[in-house]
């Protein structure tokens, strides 16, 4: 996949911008708060119709403006298409070649994007909800069917919890049965995806960190039943056994909405035994595993966004990373406050932009 051109208007603090990213490496540099991350966020939006940072839709619109727009010219599977995201008030509208997109699944494969930001490393030490969010977001990028099963499960969960809160027993059994059926489908998606990520992870970690330490990512379901033929019945029995407790606490206490991921290094929990550098390398290796999995899915590499990467990696790890993505011919956009560490890796096919107060200024390829 290749993002040939991107155009923004009234997006956050960027009033207007139009650039043609380099085929391989584009570096955007400038002080904090100038709009670098906003620009990367807009690219993620094109591929996913939602930002990678927590944000309300109106927050995406420049102060004092009524709407915002992002347009990208994308080459995927040998076909060139124009994706437009238009934001107005609290609504988002997406078109592909002037045809309205009504389902998120219709965007699938048009512009696959993997993003790494400083916030991602925090999921190593934060609670299970953060890791579930990461898992589900990355899973959706490679599996369009997942989104439907995800929404089905959480819609049923919401309805069941509503009955529990009002102590309505009528209909609860039916919703519980539906929750078990939907839950198993969700768990199977997560199990299969995590297993493949784990197969890819070790090599990526060694390439980035330059270490031979064994690393792994393992799916930890709240209820262990995904490998059984009668998994739905097993999950249903757990829900039934929890019935009285759920009524007492007015919420569904067990199930896939309590799942987690276990990150390990040297067969020990990463959050307790991994250094800060190892934790950062682990998460970045996880992102590289995502890249490979998306290539397996779509037959071509996705777009890679690296936000403030210089603050997360030392010089050796960053050199290893950039060497790896160049070998794989990945299109990469990087933001940084200090361009100096990147000057040695900039080549004739690179592009350098200075970002200041929402304005992007092209400064050549950064080579002497």
UniProtKB/Swiss-Prot annotation:
Disulfide bonds: none
An annotated GO BP: DNA synthesis involved in DNA repair
Gene3D superfamilies per the UniProt record, alphabetical: P-loop containing nucleotide triphosphate hydrolases, RecF/RecN/SMC, N-terminal domain
Function summary: The RecF protein is involved in DNA metabolism; it is required for DNA replication and normal SOS inducibility. RecF binds preferentially to single-stranded, linear DNA. It also seems to bind ATP.
Xref: PANTHER family: DNA REPLICATION AND REPAIR PROTEIN RECF
Main localisation: cytoplasm
Cellular localisation: Cytoplasm
One family name in Pfam for this protein: SMC_N
HAMAP family: RecF
GO molecular function: ATP binding; single-stranded DNA binding
Protein keywords: ATP-binding, Cytoplasm, DNA damage, DNA repair, DNA replication, DNA-binding, Nucleotide-binding, SOS response
Family to which the UniProt record says this protein belongs: Belongs to the RecF family.
GO cellular component: cytoplasm
Protein name: DNA replication and repair protein RecF
Residues given in the record as ATP binding sites: 30-37
